[in-house]
């Protein structure tokens, strides 16, 4: 059984919490799970701190998730406390604002007529929803959306 678990670890990194759940679901006796996980940790087959660092870097880059969303996803994977907070510390407020602005810019298509108040409100609601799903606070979201809509309007006036 240990070989099968090692093969799984080689396939993709897992947290201690994920492995614990998997072993429980496969019928391992509870008193065997913790010593087995301790062995894997001692052999550096699992490392929650390293997993958290890699996870935060990857999800920040690919999905542009906020620290709040990243913290929630790490907790779902069994990484909490100091390990999670150390990994999240690599994200600054400025990076988070820039990521939110980039997401908003991607959604603002050329040729959108935002002079109509109803259309502008609809676009703002959709942008707020998109940022909220990625864990951005409403204050950061509104601030970024206002800035990007103003910049978008200024670009339209140039043409």
PLM-predicted stretches and their roles:
Residues 1-159:
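An alpha-helical, amphipathic repeat domain used for nucleic-acid recognition
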């Amino acid at each position: 059984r240990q070989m099968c678990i090692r093969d799984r670890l080689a396939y993709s990194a897992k947290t201690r919490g994920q492995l614990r759940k998997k072993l429980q679901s496969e019928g391992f006796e509870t008193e065997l799970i913790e010593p087995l996980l301790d062995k894997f940790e001692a052999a550096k087959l699992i490392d929650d701190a390293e997993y958290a660092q890699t996870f935060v870097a990857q999800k920040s880059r690919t999905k542009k998730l906020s620290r709040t969303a990243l913290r929630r996803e790490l907790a779902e994977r069994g990484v909490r406390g100091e390990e999670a907070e150390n990994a999240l510390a690599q994200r600054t407020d400025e990076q988070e604002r820039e990521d939110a602005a980039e997401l908003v810019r991607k959604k603002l298509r050329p040729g959108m007529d935002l002079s109509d108040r109803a259309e502008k409100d609809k676009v703002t609601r959709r942008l707020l929803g998109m940022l909220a799903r990625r864990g951005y606070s409403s204050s950061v979201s509104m601030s970024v959306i206002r800035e990007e809509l103003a910049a978008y309007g200024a670009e339209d006036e140039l043409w």
